[in-house]
Amino acid sequence: MYSTSVNNFQYNNYSTVGTVRKTSVSNPADNKISPQSTVANKTLCAFTGSQNAIQVRTELASHEEKTKYKELLNVCPKDTKKQLNQLLKSGILLNSNSNDKSTTLDNLYKMVKTPRAQGLSNIDILAQTVNALADPHDITQQFGNIPDQYKVQTAKLNQGKAGEENVEHSGTCVASSIEFNLAQKYPAEFARFAQGLSSPEMSVNKTIKLANLADNTLDAVWLLNAFEVPYKANNFNNVELTFAPDKNAIVRAHIQTIDKDKLERSSVDVLMQSTFMQIGSQQSYDTLTDKRTGKFNQNDKGLIEFEKTFTESVVEDKNKISVTYQTVDENAKLVGYETDFATMKKQITDAINMGENVIIGYTQVNSDNTIINGHEITITGIKKSPDGKLIFVCNDTDDNMSKPVEYTEDYLLPKIHHAGLPQAVVGDEVKLVENWVEGLRTYKELKKKTA
């Protein structure tokens, strides 16, 4: 679902569709408070996912589990062995909060014992998956370079659009934020995705509740059809979706398997982010160029707010609401806010206290309050500073740092354009419009602009 105040624009397009509230606003660019980065900490934290009814197990119980664990230790690199031990001690390895109730261990074992897609390595997929689970802050959206021996091949695949395959600035911040959240909060499901997407089928199935997309079953089906996600209806309540990366993802994934540099995406990052971009872009994404088409977005990079929340909802099988906080006019000028900062702070804090991460979209403005840039990051925690104000602990997949970063409330709150929140957090504070209504409205607006 979406708030009625949604302004669906792509951050580097900045067209809005909706009335503008005339509210005065101070320039966030004048805020001199700088963000603070936390000290890098590579020790694994205990699993902090949404696990109210999930038993945390830290000991191998059955002969089968012991055998699988031993066989993984026999084949994985030295660093991965240490990380596997950490995953076991923290409860992540035996976590079974996945769509089919398989454990993280089950899926890691399958990565090693069954074939991978052509061009991928069993051990690399295992090592990269374990690393992401051990420290999700290592997940990045940074594209790697194309080695000389692959430049001719990738140029041909690019069908004559010379140079577009040399991606310098990635538009996968939404996808990588969703990937980070999946790894940190749902480790068994993350491993299940990594296993399926790297298999010869290069896909993963997921059963979701239609009620998490719309109150009415037919409206939920409309959304699935609009986003062109392959599905099979089991009944009037549930539907089985098939997620897959685009056809060129395997090229990037193979290159990152054999030529990954520091701070570049792993093969698993490539497959995950391509898949989430495919979901949000109506199956129109091209990993080779990092561009997309699709019916809801006039821009060829990234995902807009509506697409982002649909992707979050189906990946997590949760009713996520996109709440828009900033009011932006047709000239991409920040002219006000849809609510006060106290309400904004309360909603985000309530979500964090529920055990949820909050993916936010923030903007940067110039001296005239015109938006010049936008980005998606994830709020993972909250602390208090000595003066009593809040500090937001965040993850940014585009900052070239494998560690969290901290922002004061005075710095971050004025910059937040929207946030993906659980419906329970928002309650009656925001008047809601169903996903399918917002999608249809967005589609009609774009049709008018292109007519």
Regions found by a protein language model. Name each.
Residues 34, 43-44, 49, 61:
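Low-complexity, small/polar and acidic-rich linker and loop segments
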Residues 55, 59-97, 101-297, 352, ...:
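Active-site nucleophile-adjacent alpha helix/oxyanion-hole segment immediately C-terminal to the catalytic cysteine
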Residues 301, 306:
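Solvent-exposed helix/loop surface patches that form functional interfaces
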